[in-house]
Amino acid sequence: MRSLSWVCLAATLCSSAVHAGGVGLGATRMIYSADAKQSTLQVRNTHAQASFLIQSWMENANGKRTQDFVITPPLYVLKPATESVVKIIFNGKSLPQDRESLYWITVKAIPQQTKNSAGNSLQFASANRIKVFYRPASLPNNANEASQKITGEYSAGKVVLSNPTPWFITTINLKVDGKAVKPVMLPPKSSTTLEETFSRATSLTFQTINDYGAWTPVTRAPLKRK
C-alpha cells in the first residue's frame, strides 16, 4: 500500500509563559507604550532535540490580521534548547489617544518533519496567542489602580459592569453574590452586560490581571439597583 503523507495541525492557545517540551512565550500579555520605538517578546524552545519554524503575525481586536505593527523576524528557525526575541514595531497608524487599543500576537511553531514507523510524515503545529495593549503616552501612569474604578449595576435580572478608565481590564474569579460567573474583559470607557441572568444581585467580587500578568487582590463592590 502506498504510504500516505498527512499533516495534523493542532492549534493550542497557551496562557502559560512556557510550553513544556515545545515552544512557549516569555509573557502572557504585552503592553506596547506609544513612546517606545519597539517592544520585544521572548520565544523559547524547551525541546532538547527538535527545531521549530516560527511564524508570527498581529491581529486586531476582531481577530483579523493587520499591518498596524511590523514583526521581525516574521519567519525563522528556532533551534533546540534555545531562545530568541521577536521585535514588534508600531507603524504609526492613527489610534485613539484617550484610551488603550487591543491587538493580538500569534506565534506559531511548526516542528521539523518526522516519520512514524509506517513511514507517514507527522507534523504537529502549536500556536501561542496573547493580548497586546497599545498604550498612548498621554495616559496616566496608574493602570494597576484601574480595578478600583469598576462599578456594577443590577436591573431586570442582569448585571452591568462599567469601566470608566482608559485601560482594558481583564477580570478573573468574578462572582455575583458569591456565585462564580464567566469572567469578562472590560473595554475602556464602556459598559459590559454579563451573560448570566440573576433573580437577585447585591454584591460583586473579582480580581484582575495587571500589566505583569499577575492577579490583583480581591476587589469587593456593591451592585447599584437601577
Regions found by a protein language model. Name each.
Residues R2-L9:
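Sec-dependent signal peptide recognition
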Residues T66-L95, G178-S203:
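Intrinsically disordered, low-complexity Pro/Gly/Ser/Thr-rich segments with frequent PxxP/GP/PP motifs
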Residues T46-A50, P111, P164-W167:
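Short, acidic/polar linear motifs in exposed loop/turn regions
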Residues S15-A17:
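N-terminal signal peptide c-region/cleavage motif recognized by signal peptidases
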Residues L53-Q55, E59-P74, I169-A180:
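Short beta-strand and strand-turn-strand segments in soluble, beta-rich domains
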Residues S39-N45, I88, Y103-V107, K158-S162:
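Buried hydrophobic-core signal for structured, non-transmembrane domains
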